[in-house]
């Protein structure tokens, strides 16, 4: 039997088409993936992300443990509630998972990791904790709802108490705050402003319904994928995995090299990869008809690569992709589509931000 989130019945009420997503029965769409995509870019949409794994790391050595575990450095987090994005690497420098970590105190952090990798991640977190004074606790009692889009914050504000609205007033991107019974974070996976809100399970259905009543469109995994790809955000298992270096996945910015004595997991392998050079993750744009797809072969100056994620972009009106290719790539590449080679433009792997093209 697949897992179901506490919002499962709400999805069915809204006419969702349900699919198996790594063991979870989740909505792929509620009738029109394109309309859901546009709702997030133009007004406000919401996603059930309760399948994501929430983990609290608490203890005297919580900061030391996370500085060992992650390629990014939690010591940079000085303000309460500030968050960062990081890869969690293996000794070979591959990506075990990507995650967000919220800092409350040097003895108290919260991680949000992917659902598809839950058991692997929990095993890895616990194995790496050996020798550290930390307690690692999964928090399945919370549902999580992402409200995203240019009107997302104002619509969510109509559900918040005055104390909750005060708590989030002026909150910058990549922060989280516990406001009464909600944990509200200015994070997301769409390239739009909005919140990711952790709600006690027993309140989640009512909260979802109130968002619906406020005019927030329910959105499925289909729109979530086209939105994140337009925003140039990686999908674990496609754009990177345990065999791929973050340096070859446009995640170099998430590696904190200084101080040199911080010997995080995978550092030695990364240093060797950096010295030798790696492939790079780039964006591809196809302006003629056709759709770029995961797994298609790419030819560039200096060698061959592969499309890691590809789709039709509803915002741009043509196809876009991310591809891992030799670092010698130029401004154009050839993609094999239906047994012929088609020319595409090579760009930075980010296409849309705040509803506007960045090409």
UniProtKB/Swiss-Prot annotation:
GO terms for biological process: glycine decarboxylation via glycine cleavage system. Gene3D superfamilies: Aminomethyltransferase beta-barrel domains, Aminomethyltransferase fragment, Probable tRNA modification gtpase trme, domain 1. It catalyses: N(6)-[(R)-S(8)-aminomethyldihydrolipoyl]-L-lysyl-[protein] + (6S)-5,6,7,8-tetrahydrofolate = N(6)-[(R)-dihydrolipoyl]-L-lysyl-[protein] + (6R)-5,10-methylene-5,6,7,8-tetrahydrofolate + NH4(+). The keyword Transferase applies. One of its GO terms (molecular function) is transaminase activity. It is an enzyme of class 2 (transferase). Keywords: Aminotransferase, Transferase. Its EC number is 2.1.2.10. One of its GO terms (cellular component) is cytosol. HAMAP family: GcvT (MF_00259). Belongs to the GcvT family. The glycine cleavage system is composed of four proteins: P, T, L and H. The glycine cleavage system catalyzes the degradation of glycine. This is Aminomethyltransferase. It comes from Pseudoalteromonas atlantica (strain T6c / ATCC BAA-1087). The lineage of its organism: Bacteria, Pseudomonadati, Pseudomonadota, Gammaproteobacteria, Alteromonadales. The gene is gcvT.
